[in-house]
């Protein structure tokens, strides 16, 4: 097992590994970048991201693009990106048995693993490329601008309607005063 990355939990993980007596089977690679990350994805059988909080998950997209099957927690952004047994495997957040089951299924079901890997790579290529991202960003700005303009026009119409209503009430009051005269 290779654990990549750094963070506040690394010392606790190392202590757990040592306490379990599996230190010789677990390698802590630390932070990796660039070509090292690509080599790691190519060497790995599966990439597992058991996050308890993940707003988006760039590393999972990198693994998918590298044709590395992924196992993710069913939370955050990855929950929206990954469809279970379509382009990855979802597990119950914080449930080690769920993670183990997903890993074993990928290791033993080569057909499923190949299908997931292919679909995952296609999803990343089609939905997370710079052209698509720029189009989506442009659309979001257009939508926000149009919404803002529509809200401004609505406010202006409401103000105009209020002025006309006030003027009509004043005119009605003047007519009533003239008739009372």
Region locations from a protein language model:
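Short alpha-helical donor nucleotide-sugar binding micro-motif in glycosyltransferases
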Residues: 31-32, 39-44
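A short, well-ordered alpha-helix in the C-terminal region of glycosyltransferases
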Residues: 98, 105, 112-126, 133-139
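Aromatic "clamp/platform" in nucleotide-sugar-dependent glycosyltransferases that forms part
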Residues: 52
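Short hydrophobic beta-strand element within catalytic cores of glycosyltransferases
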Residues: 69-72, 82
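Nucleotide-activated donor-binding/catalytic signature segment of Leloir-type glycosyltransferases, i.e.
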Residues: 12-32
């Amino acid at each position: 097992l290779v654990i990549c990355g750094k963070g506040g939990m690394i010392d606790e993980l190392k202590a757990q590994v040592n306490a379990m007596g599996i230190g010789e089977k677990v390698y802590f690679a630390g932070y990796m970048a660039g070509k090292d990350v690509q080599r790691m994805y190519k060497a790995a059988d599966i990439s597992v991201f058991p996050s308890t909080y993940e707003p988006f998950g760039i590393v999972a997209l990198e693994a998918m693009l590298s044709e590395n099957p992924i196992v993710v927690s069913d939370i955050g952004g990855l929950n929206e990106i990954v469809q279970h047994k379509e382009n990855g495997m979802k597990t119950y957040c914080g449930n080690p048995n769920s993670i183990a089951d997903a890993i074993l299924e990928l290791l033993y079901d080569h057909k499923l693993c190949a299908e997931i890997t292919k679909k995952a790579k296609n999803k990343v290529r089609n939905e997370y490329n710079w052209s698509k991202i720029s189009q989506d960003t442009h659309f979001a700005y257009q939508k926000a601008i149009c919404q803002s303009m529509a809200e401004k026009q609505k406010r202006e119409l409401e103000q105009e309607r209020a002025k006309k209503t006030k003027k009509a009430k004043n005119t009605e009051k003047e007519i009533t005063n003239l008739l009372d005269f």
